[in-house]
Regions:
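Phosphate/NTP-binding elements of NTP-utilizing enzymes
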Residues: 55, 76, 96-99
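Short beta-strand-loop-alpha-helix junction that forms the active-site gateway
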Residues: 74-91
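Basic, flexible Lys/Arg- and Gly-enriched helix-loop patches that mediate nucleic-acid binding at interfaces
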Residues: 87-101
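Nucleic-acid nuclease catalytic cores
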Residues: 104-132
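Intrinsically disordered, low-complexity terminal regions enriched in charged/polar residues
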Residues: 128-171
């Protein structure tokens, strides 16, 4: 039986997939038994898989068929140390970015979808997309010593501002 935390995380991944399915009108689904099948030490498995199979094991969400370059990792936690973002180092976020980028390929749009109890839903994307993606008026920029600079904004606001741009860039 899965732990309460794992069940909570799986629910968030399903929520993200359902939201994107509704937004784009194509199926987005949670990766079954999501984990690092092709990430980290398992990256060698990519050499034996088709592009469609690789897409099915990247991140936590299998994107719709017209989004081959979209890589989404989902995290749902009780709390998050937001103060560490402005203090310059957030080990928790760096760990999640490690997980996200481990299975990423060059040219992917890498998105970290986060949800925290009583705080809301957030999304992080790499700053080099800022010319293409909009961040709106309220956002946080976080510089990771390992993964460069990321923009963190409200989850729903990101998709409202950038749904067309994501589709164009993820093909």
């Amino acid at each position: 039986m899965p732990s309460k935390g794992k069940t909570k995380g799986n629910g968030w991944e399903r929520e993200v997939a359902a939201s994107l399915t509704e937004l784009y009108g194509e199926p987005f689904v949670r990766v079954p038994n999501s984990g690092a099948f092709i990430g980290g030490k398992n990256a060698h498995r990519k050499s034996n898989l088709s592009e469609e199979q690789i897409r099915g094991f990247k991140g936590d969400i299998i994107p719709g068929p017209s989004f081959p370059k979209l890589n989404i990792e989902g995290k749902f936690y009780a709390d998050f140390p937001f103060h560490q973002l402005v203090q310059g180092s957030c080990k928790q976020l760096d760990q999640w970015l490690d997980q996200l980028l481990t299975s990423a390929d060059e040219g992917d749009i890498n998105i970290l979808a986060m949800k925290f109890n009583r705080k809301g839903k957030f999304l992080a994307f790499q700053d080099h997309h800022l010319g293409t993606f909009q961040a709106g008026d309220s956002y946080i920029r976080y510089h990771s010593s390992n993964h460069g600079t990321w923009t963190i904004i409200d989850f729903d606001t990101f998709w409202q501002l950038n749904s067309a741009q994501v589709k164009a860039q993820a093909q």
